[in-house]
Amino acid sequence: MGLSILEFDKNNSEKFKILHKEVITTFELNKTSVSNNKRKYELIKICYHVDKLLKTWKCSRICLEELTINSSDKGNGKTFNRLCNNVWCRNLVINKLKMLSNIHGYFITEVNPAYSSFIGNILYGNESTPDMIASSIEVARRAYNKFKKGHFYLPIQLDHLNEQWKQTLNGLNNWKEMFNKVKKLKWKYRFLLLDYIQNAVFSKTYIKQKVTLYTF
């Protein structure tokens, strides 16, 4: 789970400061040896942790991916199906956050996450902003601009990329074309947590809770 807290410029909704970046990993919690009740209990505690962050930073809104996942056979084995269909408990988390938002007076905005991981990694990903945080930044940007026409996708930006990327991707019309091109070339674009975990400024493993927190 990637979290980021942003402060947007009142005069330019595409400009913002990143105030806080955090990853909460639940790998141990997702193991088959963990009971559903234990898993749900710890997920609810994570919701309270998020709620505390919102109050600490005086946030007015929480931004989430608008996802609908139907139970199905993904064709990758029972363990993978279980992780996709059962373990995530997304509805539990969303409903708890909505309950807390009603109590404490902040808004919840859900947005279409199309290409948010790809765009997030390309625009915001770096050695101190791993994949899931980069994605959360793009989701937050979309949510902040949700009701403004033409703000769903930012213009393609290549200036910060290396020359190989610039030359190969120059002239593409949209992010979908760029994603398909990168996928076809099998280029790595994700800043994976495990590759940059040593850059976390703070980390703590909660053994009983089976959760690890990283702050970047």
Where does each model-flagged region fall?
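Positively charged, helix-rich recognition surfaces that bind polyanionic ligands
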Residues: 1-216
